[in-house]
Amino acid sequence: MSAQRLALLTPHRVAASDVDALLPAIEAACAAGDVAAVILRLAPADERALTALVKRVAPAVQAHEAALVVACPGFAGDLVSVATRGGADGVHVDKPAGLKDLRERLREGRILGTGGFETRHAAMDAGEGGADYLMFGGLYPDGEAPDAEGVRARAAWWAEIFETPCIAVACAAEEIPGHAATGAEFVGLESALWLADPAGVARAQEALGGAA
């Protein structure tokens, strides 16, 4: 397996008023380790406002050769349009009903990621629907963390059988080595692990090396 990389998850419901504080934290975190992607979890707003927000964040992420992937749970508008017009590299959707349609619309190499699976069958459907990666774990919008052991079990099952890459998301630092040991191509870091202190990314990078 090629070297594992990191994915950073922002807090849920990022709004335009959060961006000034978020940008320097993202840049410092991306510089501190081998970050493949930042998943930007936006608060629902109108498409024009969301597009403007994405335009502000995308250059900061892409300057570090990382991909910006946009998520917006509860948004009823056109997330693909927001991502493409904002210059993002892709979109992330949970429990998608129209994954194949999204896949057809996301062209020019843009990324389609998905998560929020309640069953293995749902995960397999997502893989067959054209997702570029599957994400296991991550804080729920209410701030509750999933069972870390369950996240590891699902990620290990997926990584062993399927070719589509997966992200195993750590909500606490002590989860990182175990998540890395699943064989997942990426280990995700919740914002508590990097937002206030970019050194958390460097420590996570060291943990990946120890799990290899």
Where are these regions (language model features)?
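Acidic, Mg2+-coordinating phosphoryl-transfer loop and its flanking beta/alpha structural elements
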Residues: V187-L189
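Short, acidic/turn-prone active-site loops that include or flank metal/cofactor-
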Residues: K95-L99, F117-T119, G138-P141, S191-L195
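Short beta-strand-loop elements within alpha/beta enzyme cores
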Residues: Y133-G137
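Conserved N-terminal beta1-alpha1 strand-loop-helix module at the mouth
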Residues: M1-H92, L106-D132, P146-E149, W157, ...
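Conserved active-site neighborhood of the chymotrypsin/trypsin-like protease fold
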Residues: L102
